[in-house]
């Protein structure tokens, strides 16, 4: 099994913006290329968790890479398009609400990261994963980097790709279920989303029934997604699976 380690430097050491310092240190030890791993969608009540793996070209790093949460939606879209165009490799993977319910959100997030790394069209010699936990079963050594999307440009790029892809998936799903408002909250527990759940009930294959308020409310009824709605949910949630860098350059999702 590949060796792994957890990296938790002091928070006051955070750079103004993520840079390539960690990657260069690893590459100088003869471990190249380096992949960044991150996920989006751990907190929402609905939808998949999406992970991305990105191998940046050190000579073509997009300007303005940052923690995706610090950027506007327009800035994220622009940067993600550039990442798909200039990165050495990009891969995206997702796990649906049912998979999250079967295990838990942490295990599902780590599994999505593992699948994203496996989907890269190049074999990384090392990986950097955002957070405190390392995905099990990786084919290369990995370091967990706390606040990694604020420290490492590779992780920041993966964070942005995962966020944009997941948002697009939820917006596409919401086109057939406009009363839930997925186009605006993309599954998070906003007041509008909670009101829609109260009014219409949770949606099978979409809402995470192991999450509050479902687990604590004793809610048994679900809307069964059928016909076009079921097909859209299935296609939207699988749209990112198996995406690799060369395919992604033309159309991110």
Swiss-Prot record:
Superkingdom, natural source: Bacteria
Family: Belongs to the RNase HII family.
Binding residues for a divalent metal cation: 38-39, 130
Cofactor binding: number and manner: Manganese or magnesium. Binds 1 divalent metal ion per monomer in the absence of substrate. May bind a second metal ion after substrate binding.
Recorded GO CC terms: cytoplasm; ribonuclease H2 complex
GO molecular function: manganese ion binding; RNA binding; RNA-DNA hybrid ribonuclease activity
Cofactors, names only: Mn(2+); Mg(2+)
EC numbers for this chain: 3.1.26.4
Alphabetical UniProt keywords: Cytoplasm, Endonuclease, Hydrolase, Manganese, Metal-binding, Nuclease
Location(s), subcellular: Cytoplasm
Pfam families: RNase_HII
Transmembrane segments: none
GO biological process: DNA replication, removal of RNA primer; mismatch repair
Highest classification ranks of the organism: Bacteria, Pseudomonadati, Pseudomonadota, Alphaproteobacteria, Hyphomicrobiales
Descriptive protein name: Ribonuclease HII
Job description of the protein: Endonuclease that specifically degrades the RNA of RNA-DNA hybrids.
Species assigned in the record: Chelativorans sp. (strain BNC1)
């Amino acid at each position: 099994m590949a060796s792994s380690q957890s990296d938790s430097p002091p928070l006051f050491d955070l750079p103004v913006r993520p840079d390539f310092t960690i990657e260069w240190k690893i590459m100088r030890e003869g471990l190249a290329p380096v992949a960044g791993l991150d996920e989006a969608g751990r907190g929402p009540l609905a939808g998949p968790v999406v992970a991305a793996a990105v191998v940046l070209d050190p000579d073509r790093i997009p300007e303005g890479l940052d923690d995706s949460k610090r950027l506007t939606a327009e800035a994220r879209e622009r940067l993600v398009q550039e990442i798909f165009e200039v990165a050495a490799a990009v891969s995206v993977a997702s796990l649906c609400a049912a998979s999250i319910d079967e295990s838990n959100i942490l295990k599902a997030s780590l599994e999505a990261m593992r699948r994203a790394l496996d989907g890269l069209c190049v074999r990384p010699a090392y990986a950097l994963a955002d957070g405190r936990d390392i995905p099990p079963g990786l084919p290369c050594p990995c370091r967990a980097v706390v606040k990694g999307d604020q420290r490492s440009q590779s992780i920041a790029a993966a964070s942005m790709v995962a966020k944009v892809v997941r948002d697009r998936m939820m917006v596409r799903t919401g086109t057939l279920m406009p009363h839930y408002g997925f186009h605006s909250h993309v599954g998070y527990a906003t007041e509008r989303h909670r009101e829609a759940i109260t009014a219409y009930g949770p949606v099978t294959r979409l809402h995470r029934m192991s999450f509050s308020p479902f687990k604590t409310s004793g809610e048994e009824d679900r809307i069964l997604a059928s016909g076009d709605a079921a097909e859209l949910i299935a296609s939207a949630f699988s749209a990112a699976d198996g995406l690799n860098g060369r395919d992604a350059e033309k159309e991110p999702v």
